[in-house]
Swiss-Prot record:
It comes from the Eukaryota. Belongs to the biotin--protein ligase family. Residues 378-606 form the BPL/LPL catalytic domain. GO terms for molecular function: ATP binding; biotin--[biotin carboxyl-carrier protein] ligase activity. Pfam families: BPL_LplA_LipB, BPL_N. GO terms for cellular component: cytoplasm; nucleus. Its EC number is 6.3.4.-, 6.3.4.9, 6.3.4.10, 6.3.4.11. This is Biotin--protein ligase. The gene is BPL1. One of its GO terms (biological process) is protein modification process. Monomer. It is an enzyme of class 6 (ligase).
Amino acid sequence: MNVLVYNGPGTTPGSVKHAVESLRDFLEPYYAVSTVNVKVLQTEPWMSKTSAVVFPGGADLPYVQACQPIISRLKHFVSKQGGVFIGFCAGGYFGTSRVEFAQGDPTMEVSGSRDLRFFPGTSRGPAYNGFQYNSEAGARAVKLNLPDGSQFSTYFNGGAVFVDADKFDNVEILATYAEHPDVPSSDSGKGQSENPAAVVLCTVGRGKVLLTGPHPEFNVRFMRKSTDKHFLETVVENLKAQEIMRLKFMRTVLTKTGLNCNNDFNYVRAPNLTPLFMASAPNKRNYLQEMENNLAHHGMHANNVELCSELNAETDSFQFYRGYRASYDAASSSLLHKEPDEVPKTVIFPGVDEDIPPFQYTPNFDMKEYFKYLNVQNTIGSLLLYGEVVTSTSTILNNNKSLLSSIPESTLLHVGTIQVSGRGRGGNTWINPKGVCASTAVVTMPLQSPVTNRNISVVFVQYLSMLAYCKAILSYAPGFSDIPVRIKWPNDLYALSPTYYKRKNLKLVNTGFEHTKLPLGDIEPAYLKISGLLVNTHFINNKYCLLLGCGINLTSDGPTTSLQTWIDILNEERQQLHLDLLPAIKAEKLQALYMNNLEVILKQFINYGAAEILPSYYELWLHSNQIVTLPDHGNTQAMITGITEDYGLLIAKELVSGSSTQFTGNVYNLQPDGNTFDIFKSLIAKKVQS
């Protein structure tokens, strides 16, 4: 499910960053946290796939102006569908029934009713004087009282007090200001409530609404980058000592909305990067020397102080060491307590008498095991770059062309156990945990086939890569062909939902998984995403250089399911049938099998074209005879029958109205329209035959 953070008129870059990063820390991998604009919230079918919508800090009035078209959708999402609305600071003002901001100040006053009305009363602010737009001048570490009697301080800059919150039956006060605000917190009596509400939780229909005046989502790690010395000394230093309490509070309030949060505090901090280890297949050691020569050509030079070589690439800087044992301590210590996106990345090449790093340096990925299962004749994957904690296996290659162009053609696989800046479609980033195997393969393709002399369409690479991964899973060991995993066009892997399997009392062992008999839709979703592919294309030495970035849920179930879960389910069936149990799945073997299949499939495609590969693809995709609606053509119903061999578009034949078997003769080519939630809800169709 998605958690959508509004990023549009009224937001500030800093507030969006804090909200996104903080929510990812607490909610991933159970939810996919990403930013959206008004157009997405107005036009795309996001509600059925979303658990929460978040409005971060900024300015309330632009929210009112820009978001008027989506007010009714937000209210329906919360009250009717049981969704969660979260408003931090300006988002908190936006979610109330009335705003009174800086009353009496002719330069800043904003007063008026608000249409969301999740909180039935007034939000009044700034709760404390001194606020200035786009400034830290009025910022402070504000002390909050919690219901259990404890206190902690968090960042505050212009937020509201929720007036008379204790008088509303549907409102729970989660935190109050320890010091009386500078504005009236009550409209009765002396004008001050004994419990001036700073954070409230409202029950609205079937849903929950969390509104805050202060910024408990603000991470002190990002605030340390401020150049304001006074702010650093008076606010940031105070907040550093409060970080554990802030984390506990955030988890508490997010959990109260019904969201599923991580249980480990270590998960909410980006861990230190670890060294990257470069190794080769035993018979491909010459590729290591070729890469080092290429790096020198691109400017790698010796650093006699650090006893390493350095390369200042396009986005990142790199330090290259030689010798796993000799260099590990120095390479590791240079990464400690450094921001992952700012520190030079360290890469260790083997020493003269070394082949594979000692296992104690890579306890979560046995590189020797990987090369054991890699075909000896393989070029793809014959160089392995592994890091336990990396920024992103894709971004580090995609953003540093001098590094990328130093890699021998079609050789490298980059694997990471934990990504602190994992990258997905639309530029989304996240921290992926252990149990989600992230990898990026670097493959090179000619512009034309050496056999047929036909131009090669690189769009097919995403199909071929998913086909290779699917084949690797199903051939992992005897019995793995029963795992119900299939390809969702164009580049995702989906598995049958364990919940659906149990509800329907299905049996899969030795029966053959017939995915065509199961529904592919939202009414009763039978499938869950377990893997996605991101392809980045470069042009190097008159050839395509393609980065195939893929993450797959091996053992981590959040937010969907995993391969290991399905192995466990099938083993329950096998035990009842007195069959040998399936082995646990290991990232090392799976990655090697993926490379083996990719090598074979790519060669077939390059030499003989898409026609050679598509029959295998059709056997493992979800869409044979799927019926789709074409909104650009009067909501015509059409049946998917295949993929074009030139540009990889879907082929759909128009159905006679009311029939699921008879065709009109009209044929359409279909492609996605960029819809980030359900590509089959909004396909762009071009008629190619009538």
